Amino acid sequence: MSREQRGPNEKLGTVLALAGISNAGLARRVNDLGAQRGLTLRYDKTSVARWVAKGMVPQGAAPHLIAAAIGAKLGRPVPLHEIGLADADPAPEVGLAFPRDVGEAVRSATELYRLDLAGRRGGGGIWQSLAGSFSVSAYATPASRWLITPADPSVARDPTAAQAAILGARGGGSGSPGGAGARGPGAAPDARGAHLLHPGGATPGAAGSVPLQPGPEAVADASPLRVGHSDVSKLREAAQDARRWDSKYGGGDWRSSMVPECLRVDAAPLLLGSYTDEVGRALFGASAELTRLAGWMAFDTGQQEAAQRYYIQALRLARAAADVPLGGYVLASMSLQATYRGFADEGVDLAQAAVERNRGLATARTMSFFRLVEARAHAKAGDAPAAGAALKGAESWLERSRAGDSDPPWLGFYGYDRFAADAAECYRDLKAPRQVRRFTEQALSRPTEEFVRSHGLRLVVSAVAELESGNLDAACAAGTRAVEVAGRISSARTTEYVRDLLHRLEPYGDEPRVAELRERARPLLVTPG
């Protein structure tokens, strides 16, 4: 469906001519990009002619897909306003900026937190309308700016600047969705105590662990908070809880979904407060951890557009924290997303940026993880020698790590079992089933209760390796266990792995074992991940 504009869209016509894309070629590319994102689109050259000659504006994700298709041909990002479709975007550029100024960085992050709130209150409409807008080229500027300057010189904010920031947030920045409604109660709450982790130490799932919704009185006073180390500690505790919930229950579980709420209710007013440089660095670090987690959870639930925006803001906050290893961790997350979305070369670049900037700074275990992420990208690109070298480097760094090293808390998930699991996926992409089986056996030998999702993913990789080795019985057995695990968590990524396994089993569809596995997986595949 399309809605009408006034007059021809000359901007779109001009850019199409510049890119050398025909109407039929653009329609075909938009349909293909939509299919990659689970959308069924049937545009043709006549559709494109209407967009250009009559100014018709396609609805839903189409404007972003058009921009992505043209951007891929031009080799650079193409914003919607350049192709005359800015009005189609409910949140133009929100979360995609990587400001040089610290104050603008705070504004950019808190705008994103409000955007996510508006999306949730509207039934996810904003993220649905942005479906298909993920563009790996949007990572280019953030990555290059971070590489040049991985740490801001000062982040202290005095009360006067903090008060101005609060008033600015209340007024709503450009691009805030929903007009006044998005700038109402909750835009810049001014009260402590509504923490994801209850101050009294409530356990996950208890009523006190849910962030409180601030009422109108919460923003009645523009007096800025004076942020202290205790405030930062509560954010770090929240991040620790969220990491545990995500690993155990998946990014779509209700516990994990409270992270964006924590950012809006708890982190935003602190970021808009006043603080010394020392406290500010710690605050930006804790906020960066939570923001990266929000991106990771969005990635796990298939919301690639939200994930990309959170990752960009997390990288900017890590720069303000002067935490180079954390910035590298965000780049590694970007790399994994780019690789997963089919942009392996860009995934290599992002991972290598994390590695090179952290030489002499990060712990051995941290460097090992960055090299492992690099290996994943090389393997996806089909570069076996480069993947092997990166895996060897990752293993070497891991062997050099020691229990007493000052590893960051966010790396608690990483050990030899995770190395083995990712090595197995590398060899799966390189079509080396014998190596896949060897590393998968090692990965599955560890306890699974804390990392349920990872266990499910490893079982699927094991099933694929068994299938490629000609062991149908073993493949179905591992697949059955994977389906059982996937049914216990909320993870679109895990469901996608299961779907891929079933696709690989289609040539054996007449086998009773395969039919039984498909039947077991049916409830999982019809339930939103």
UniProtKB/Swiss-Prot annotation:
Residues 169-184 have a biased composition (Gly residues). InterPro entries: TPR-like_helical_dom_sf (IPR011990). Keywords: Sporulation. Residues 13-31 bind DNA. Residues 167-226 are annotated as: Disordered. GO terms for biological process: sporulation resulting in formation of a cellular spore. Might be a catalyst/regulator pair of proteins involved in the temporal controlled sporulation process. The decrease in level of the smaller protein early in sporulation may relieve negative regulation of the activity of the larger protein. This is 55.5 kDa and 49.5 kDa sporulation proteins. It comes from Streptomyces griseus.
